[in-house]
From Swiss-Prot:
Its main location: plastid. Belongs to the reaction center PufL/M/PsbA/D family. Pfam families: Photo_RC. Its EC number is 1.10.3.9. The D1/D2 heterodimer binds P680, chlorophylls that are the primary electron donor of PSII, and subsequent electron acceptors. It shares a non-heme iron and each subunit binds pheophytin, quinone, additional chlorophylls, carotenoids and lipids. There is also a Cl(-1) ion associated with D1 and D2, which is required for oxygen evolution. The PSII complex binds additional chlorophylls, carotenoids and specific lipids. HAMAP family: PSII_PsbD_D2. This is Photosystem II D2 protein. The gene is psbD.
């Protein structure tokens, strides 16, 4: 019996092959199968955000002006979260809340749900785009893995946190000043800066910035001067076989500065990937914990002593009082429908008052 080995070839292309060629090969800018998710979702998310910040008020959900039409600027305009009474409703345009009325849908905060969900899928589509293109040109998938960090932060902050709370109302609104207010809310209600996951996130992001600065400066310091423009892009070309900078010289320099240095480019660049991505993932895990109302570090002994001794106060106890002030102010301001009224004696004051 004879067995013929060879590559199977089809005589004619089926619909899948035609679509595959159209999406991945027959164009200058790569679209890909991931583009079927990325481009529509990104278009709708950005379009919804521009529409909301330009025209839509937050009067009915937050009692605020939030659009350019009402006098806001780029820093104060926002697409605001739905009202607290709407809980976790998806706020579909054709759903029982809006009943197909576009104006009512906007007034209820439907654009926020629209932007958040389409934005999440757009980010996932962008990560899949990196996977798909890397596979097409036979690259490893570390770009996509790195981009999982921002996706984890977005999903945890905008989706998982409000799902753990009483409604979408407690998610951040999509705007600059709105995000700042959400950060203050996180500090006041969760003592976020004293959360170990936040500390790891800060270490990751700032550590990555430090690594990038050191790496860029070191490469610039150790360039081979083998052209008439060694300090510009003119001296080198993308296909050169030679190294652009001297790793040996860089290693000797940092060995003298710190006593230790990276001796391997692969380990160096993996570390530059590992630090920020791990920091972002730790932050995302911390926000998931906040969704479940897990607490940060508590130094109760200091709080008890500060309450008993008027002369004893630490930066920690001062921050706890500050958090109480944030809660007392924001609870009444952000939830006017609750009619929260705090008498003077419950408002926080330091030992100095």
């Amino acid at each position: 019996m004879t067995i013929a080995l060879g590559k199977f070839t089809k005589d004619e292309k089926d619909l899948f092959d035609i679509m595959d060629d159209w999406l991945r090969r027959d164009r200058f800018v790569f679209v890909g199968w991931s583009g079927l998710l990325l481009f529509p979702c990104a278009y709708f998310a950005l379009g919804g955000w521009f529409t909301g910040t330009t025209f839509v008020t937050s009067w009915y959900t937050h009692g605020l002006a939030s659009s350019y039409l009402e006098g806001c600027n780029f820093l104060t305009a926002a697409v605001s979260t739905p009202a607290n009474s709407l809980a976790h409703s998806l706020l579909l345009l054709w759903g029982p809340k809006a009943q197909g009325d576009f104006t009512r849908w906007c007034q209820l905060g439907g654009l926020w749900a629209f932007v958040a969900l389409h934005g999440a899928f757009a980010l996932i589509g962008f990560m899949l785009r990196q996977f798909e293109l890397a596979r097409s040109v036979q690259l490893r998938p570390y770009n996509a893995i790195a981009f999982s960090g921002p996706i984890a932060v977005f999903v945890s902050v905008f989706l998982i946190y409000p799902l753990g709370q009483s409604g979408w109302f407690f998610a951040p609104s999509f705007g600059v000043a709105a995000i700042f207010r959400f950060i203050l809310f996180f500090q006041g209600f969760h003592n976020w800066t004293l959360n170990p996951f936040h500390m790891m996130g800060v270490a990751g992001v700032l550590g990555a910035a430090l690594l990038c600065a050191i790496h860029g400066a070191t490469v610039e310091n150790t360039l081979f001067e083998d052209g008439d423009g060694a300090n510009t892009f003119r001296a080198f070309n993308p296909t050169q076989a030679e190294e652009t900078y001297s790793m040996v010289t860089a290693n000797r320099f940092w060995s003298q500065i710190f006593g230790v240095a990276f001796s391997n480019k692969r380990w160096l660049h993996f570390f530059m990937l590992f630090v920020p991505v791990t920091g972002l993932w730790m932050s995302a895990l911390g926000v998931v914990g906040l969704a479940l109302n897990l607490r940060a570090y508590d130094f109760v002994s200091q709080e008890i002593r500060a309450a008993e001794d008027p002369e004893f106060e630490t930066f920690y106890t001062k921050n706890i009082l500050l958090n109480e002030g944030i809660r007392a102010w924001m609870a009444a301001q952000d939830q006017p429908h609750e009619n929260l009224i705090f008498p003077e004696e419950v408002l926080p004051r330091g030992n100095a008052l």
